[in-house]
A protein has these predicted regions:
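Conserved C-terminal structural/oligomerization subdomain of aldehyde/semialdehyde dehydrogenase
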Residues: 1-7, 115, 135-137, 238, ...
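N-terminal Rossmann-like NAD(P)+-binding subdomain of aldehyde/semialdehyde dehydrogenases
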Residues: 1-73, 116
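Hydrophobic alpha-helical scaffolding
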Residues: 34, 74, 116, 143, ...
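Hydrophobic packing residues within well-ordered alpha-helices of enzyme cores
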Residues: 48, 123-126, 153, 174, ...
């Protein structure tokens, strides 16, 4: 059934009239450019295409192992949890809830879905589309509420598993409240390393700009910390980053309102960073002008602050530098080849290991064979790590895993592996039908 529903829904989202409707609806509630909002619709449509026909059935493929006597065999099954809950954030009003909701349904669960109330109209409309495509209305419960009400519902209803996508603070509270019966895709302070091989300067500058400032930096995968190898110091990379950032404007929402930080709080953070010895403002650091954005939201120009590497790793500075600002903001630093162990130490100390990028086509750098301790990929744990000249931190499509690593509570999204990990558990059933040997007798007690 769900293969058929997916096929019909994928077809609907492929229609220009429907995709434009959802793109515009996303823009109404989430400050994104048209192209960024359309990206959500596109990924969602492709995800649904991936699970048409028998692909849903294949998700639940089991296996059998012969036993140790005639008539015995064990069967391993992917088993649904049953009653589950899904809580999703404001920054991807369509993509995250649809991919997680459908994953839960594909594996046979009964979900209650809560989307951030600021943007929940998008998913309300999508549910109506799914109902029109054959989704039984009783298969999904959809709730609009504040966080406190949802927390009470979770504690009283006691779902067997809850998927939470959102802030680390709320994630840790829920993990305690729900006694660990939770999967998390929470905050990411995501880093990018530019390796020693300098090439394709314009392309790499553009990707850095997209990673840091698309959707006004309000992605859990947004580039938060950029490490630039000293070989790039002779290039115009920083000036190109500045030029790209300055062409973003409120009129087309290539920069826009920040929904979880005020302008004052973001600028206060910038000023604190500028008190660190050797730090400097590379660009931005000013409020947007000529707008009517309410003061409860943030509105600043795309901003980058340089902080020396040796200052970043100092205990008194590290927590400040690695504070996630969910807005158009990033830290930039540089490093020498001999300082790579310091860079790796800084990465290891981070608590959120979501996305990362190692921008280099130098295989010795990617695997870091300088010394055992100098490993880049081998000494990091980010669940979605891009490596190579075109490496990025954002823009994950539907065709590869997206999620953190290094935490047993970590959730993935989009792929068969992610769906099976998050929305099912392993159950083993051992069939032992005999026959009992003809000469069997009751043995001595043991």
């Amino acid at each position: 059934m769900y293969g058929d529903i997916s096929a019909k829904a994928a077809h609907m989202l492929s229609l220009p009239k429907v995709s434009d409707f959802f793109t515009r609806l996303i823009q109404r509630v989430s400050p994104k450019s048209y192209q960024q909002a359309y990206g959500e619709v596109y990924v969602t449509q492709k995800f649904l295409e991936n699970f048409c026909g028998d692909q849903v059935r294949f998700l639940a493929r089991s296996f059998a192992v012969p036993g140790n006597h005639l008539g015995q065999q064990s069967h391993g099954f992917r088993w649904p949890y049953g009653p589950v809950a899904i809580i999703t954030p404001f920054n991807f009003p369509l993509e995250i809830p649809v991919l997680q909701l459908m994953g839960a349904l594909y594996m046979g669960n009964k979900p209650v879905l809560k989307v951030d109330s600021k943007v929940s109209i998008v998913m309300e409309q999508m549910l109506r589309l799914l109902h029109n495509c054959g989704l039984p209305v009783e298969d999904v419960d959809f709730i609009n509420s504040d966080g406190k009400t949802m927390n009470k519902l979770l504690q009283e209803a006691n779902p067997r598993m809850t998927l939470f996508t959102g802030s680390s603070r709320v994630a840790e509270k829920l993990a305690g409240d729900l006694k660990g019966k939770i999967k998390l895709e929470d905050a990411g302070f995501d880093w990018k390393i530019l390796g020693p091989d300098v090439q394709q300067e314009d392309y790499i500058a553009w990707v850095c700009d997209q990673d840091a400032y698309a959707c006004s930096g309000q992605k859990c995968s947004a580039q938060s910390l950029l490490f630039i190898h000293e070989n790039w110091s002779q290039t115009s990379l920083i000036s190109k980053l500045k030029d790209l950032a300055e062409r973003r404007k409120l009129e087309d929402l290539t920069v826009g309102p920040v929904l979880t930080f005020t302008t004052d709080s973001m600028l206060e953070h910038v000023n604190k960073l500028l008190e660190i010895p050797g730090s400097k403002l590379l660009f931005g650091g000013q409020p947007l002008k000529d707008h009517s954005i309410p003061s409860i939201y943030g509105a600043i120009k795309p901003t980058a602050v340089y902080v020396p590497l040796e200052e970043i790793v100092k205990g008194k500075n590290y927590e400040l530098v690695t504070k996630e600002i969910f807005g158009p903001f990033q830290i930039v630093t540089d490093y020498k080849s001999s300082q790579l162990p310091i860079v790796l130490d800084a990465l290891e100390r981070m608590h959120a290991h979501l996305t990362a990028a190692v921008v280099s086509n130098d295989p010795l750098f990617l695997q870091a064979r300088f010394y055992v301790t100098n490993q880049v990929i081998g000494n990091t744990v980010n669940g979605t790590t891009y490596a190579g000249l075109r490496a990025r931190t954002t823009g994950a499509p539907q065709n590869h895993w997206f999620g953190p690593a290094g935490d047993p509570r970590g959730a993935g999204i989009g792929t068969p592996e992610a769906i099976k990990l998050v929305w099912s558990c392993h159950r083993e059933i051992i069939y032992d039908v005999g026959p009992v040997p003809n000469n069997w007798e009751i043995p001595p007690s043991t």
